């Protein structure tokens, strides 16, 4: 049986010790997995270390574990990827976040654009961002990453594109002259823009060009927004990262 991996939001002592799991983790371990004292876990706290652990006490609302000294396990790609994803409807955004993290994305910023079909504000938006961060944690627990990517607050497309960045800035465009295979080597940082289901407006495309974004073409077929993100990330990891 595979040993469950559990994220711990507080820094763990490198030499080992005891700690109570977070409320979310305790609920997952105690109620969902139905684990009990004596069973093994693996903890990670975002420091790129993993900690072998054993449950010493398991109640309905509290789980306490004893953990050994940490061991460094770096599973991060040499390519730093910042995904700017215009928010999509329903579960599509959740799917994009989950799979992008499995593929090695480091930062995700949800974006608002002219043709964005998602209308969220205030408390609903805060709850959605918290939910997306939980999805990011669960994705890391599943795929073996020991650093949890950041889900940043929602921004407008214009403000995100205007942020200083010393990496390569890419925007997918169906009539672009460049493909990923024609991009120059080496590249260690990329800011990747994925537009909404209806695409970016002409003014938005022009704006990305003034902000230093390079238009690239993925291929001859039209992809859905959630497919576009994952296809682009995979291709970039194959060329510049740790896939393939």
Curated annotation (Swiss-Prot):
GO biological process: rRNA base methylation
Residue numbers spanned by region Disordered: 1-21
Single GO cellular component term: cytoplasm
Main location: cytoplasm
Subcellular location: Cytoplasm
Catalytic reactions on record: uridine(1498) in 16S rRNA + S-adenosyl-L-methionine = N(3)-methyluridine(1498) in 16S rRNA + S-adenosyl-L-homocysteine + H(+)
Entry GO MF terms: rRNA (uridine-N3-)-methyltransferase activity
InterPro entries, per the entry: Alpha/beta_knot_MTases, PUA-like_sf, RsmE, RsmE_MTase_dom, RsmE_PUA-like, tRNA_m1G_MTases_N
Family annotation (Pfam families): Methyltrans_RNA (PF04452), PUA_4 (PF20260)
Keyword annotations: Cytoplasm, Methyltransferase, rRNA processing, S-adenosyl-L-methionine, Transferase
Keyword match S-adenosyl-L-methionine: yes
General function of this protein: Specifically methylates the N3 position of the uracil ring of uridine 1498 (m3U1498) in 16S rRNA. Acts on the fully assembled 30S ribosomal subunit.
This protein's name: Ribosomal RNA small subunit methyltransferase E
Species of provenance: Dickeya dadantii (strain 3937) (Erwinia chrysanthemi (strain 3937))
